[in-house]
Design a protein with these regions (language model features):
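Short, structured "edge-of-domain" segments at secondary-structure transitions
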Residues: 3-240
Length: 240
């Protein structure tokens, strides 16, 4: 679910931002001017890009509208970004469960309507594991990767090469058997202000990038309903 809303009178005690259905949870919130483009990604390896104005503003108690169609009950959204149409310096970084990642130009993600299947953003295989993170980055940023074992590395974004959407990317971190990525985050250029506990890392030389063919799957959608119901997209979209 995705929604737009204004917070003109915030209270010290906080306000209700969204109604959460049973079994669901809030993943992310982003500050925006209402004129950006939204990207959402799911762990099965797809992402969608749509204009923010396609989402009508709703009240704080609303559930929101459908942003992207998930594959099944085990699939879920793993990342959300808001990108400016004028910002050509940013790329989209994706990271998989087994430590693979890559950067892809934003323009490789075609603009569609919300609620569709989107397009492939990483080639998910048994080797890569599920998609765990999506973020917009600059070459001057750093990437922080934290593993379930507690190991954390920091590496420069400019060390991660660009690749097409339908590839698995390069190995960003070597994991011990049974370990996997727990969280990812980015930090801007802060000089030498790195945490002493963080191990400075480099992108692995195991840069096996594999391309796959793309397929299209039509998506049917339904019309808008009231603020307290799920709202699906109005136009057909496809997955590549």
């Amino acid at each position: 679910m995705y929604k737009r809303q204004e917070f003109s009178r915030p209270r010290v005690s906080g306000v209700n931002a969204i109604t959460i259905n049973e079994g669901d949870e809030l993943l992310a919130a982003r500050l925006t001017d209402g004129n950006n483009e939204v990207m959402m990604a799911i762990k099965s390896g797809r992402a969608i890009r749509f204009p923010e104005e396609k989402v009508r503003p709703t009240g704080r108690g609303a559930i929101g509208v459908a942003g992207i169609e998930v594959d099944d009950e085990t699939d879920e959204v793993v990342g959300l970004v808001c990108v400016s149409r004028e910002d050509k310096d940013r790329t989209i970084l994706v990271v998989s469960q087994q430590g693979f990642g890559k950067r892809t130009p934003i323009d490789e993600y075609r603009i569609t309507n919300r609620g569709g299947k989107g397009v492939k953003t990483i080639n998910v295989t048994e080797k890569t594991g599920s998609l765990v993170g999506l973020m917009d980055v600059l070459e001057s940023d750093d990437l922080i990767i934290t593993c379930k074992s507690g190991v954390t590395i920091r590496t420069s974004i400019n060390e991660i090469r660009e690749a097409g959407r339908a590839t698995q990317g390069v190995k960003l971190i070597r994991l011990d058997e049974g370990d996997e990525i727990a969280a990812t985050s980015k930090i801007g250029d802060q000089g030498e202000d790195a945490d002493a506990e963080i191990v400075e890392g480099e992108v692995s030389s195991e840069s096996n990038v594999e391309a796959t063919d793309s397929t299209e799957t039509p998506n049917d959608a339904s019309s808008d309903s009231n603020d307290n119901t799920i709202d699906n997209a109005g136009d057909n979209t496809s997955v590549e």
